[in-house]
Amino acid sequence: MDYQDAGVNIEAGRSFVDKIRRSVESTYNAQVLGGLGGFGGYFELPTGYENPVLVSGTDGVGTKLKIAQALNRHQTIGIDLVAMCVNDILTSGAKPLFFLDYLATGKLNPQQLSDVVTGIVEGCHLSDCALLGGETAEMPGFYGVGEYDVAGFCVGVVEKANLLDGSQINIGDVAIGLSSSGVHSNGFSLVRKIVEVNGLSWGDRFESLGNQTLGEVLLTPTQIYVKPILEALKSGIEIKGMAHITGGGLPENLPRCLNNNQSIKINSESWSILPIFQWIANMGNVATAAMFDTFNMGIGFVIIVPKNQGKTSIEWLKSQGISAYEIGEVIEGNRELVGL
């Protein structure tokens, strides 16, 4: 008996690395030292920083994976994975430098996982960061055949003097909401339950969703905000704080960028709720408060700017292809959302 008899194919693992090598190395830049396959990845800090601060983040995609696996569509999951990590560290003002991934599966399917890595590579290109390394674990008996899980890890850098920690935010500043591309990567356990209870399938089409299949709409990849936000910072827009709207929605995530004596008065009618959220609320009989507590509701990222830069910020973001709205104002309070 050998390792392969136990369900672990080492040769398939080597072949998989060879299959993805060229794609992964397309993300490399001058700061990457060495190639794929070492015990560690080497990255030289870029020059030009007086007091560089490294910012790290890690995340996964949750049960959105169940839909991808049911439909055998894995190409966009990698974009979701990168987005969940880089958008998080972006809130501090950090530029992503490099990304690492962890893929675990019951039986290594080279094409399936290559599709996942293709998405990770695309996400890295969209974030201007290197895919520095990763780990692929074949775990028979732990995951079923065709099942896999993913986790991502990223590191970025920001000048210490430019680190956004909320201390710059003042009463009267405004919250600018950047549109999401859809459900992103949170709330899928509730979505899956609604589909199950209603006896639906991922291939069902709905007029309210533009006659796309439910699976197509739900697998829309998470928006990556890195390039427009970093360009906004360079353009002179005075961004004082940022929030990535993930699990817990606006009520949980937006107050995280505030000081202890501040809240945000929100105007939930200042943007249009995406059709997929109307569909979820109707099909699942989900109360409005629960929807906002679970989903991004069409706002995937928020920046805090001075009131006199609100309109300018919105127009600038629109010029970059991002729809944006003034969704609220900073008021005195206790780090909570008022008005929902």
From Swiss-Prot:
Keyword ATP-binding found: yes
Pathway(s) it belongs to: Purine metabolism; IMP biosynthesis via de novo pathway; 5-amino-1-(5-phospho-D-ribosyl)imidazole from N(2)-formyl-N(1)-(5-phospho-D-ribosyl)glycinamide: step 2/2
Subcellular location, record wording: Cytoplasm
Catalytically driven reaction(s): 2-formamido-N(1)-(5-O-phospho-beta-D-ribosyl)acetamidine + ATP = 5-amino-1-(5-phospho-beta-D-ribosyl)imidazole + ADP + phosphate + H(+)
Gene3D superfamilies (alphabetical): PurM-like C-terminal domain, PurM-like, N-terminal domain
Pfam families, sorted: AIRS (PF00586), AIRS_C (PF02769)
Recorded GO MF terms: ATP binding; phosphoribosylamine-glycine ligase activity; phosphoribosylformylglycinamidine cyclo-ligase activity
Class of enzymatic activity (EC top level): ligase
InterPro entries linked to this entry: PurM-like_C_dom (IPR010918), PurM-like_C_sf (IPR036676), PurM-like_N (IPR016188), PurM-like_N_sf (IPR036921), PurM_cligase (IPR004733)
A biological process from GO: adenine biosynthetic process
Keywords carried by this UniProt record: ATP-binding, Cytoplasm, Ligase, Nucleotide-binding, Purine biosynthesis
EC number: 6.3.3.1
NCBIfam families: purM
Protein name, entry field: Phosphoribosylformylglycinamidine cyclo-ligase
The organism of origin for this protein: Crocosphaera subtropica (strain ATCC 51142 / BH68) (Cyanothece sp. (strain ATCC 51142))
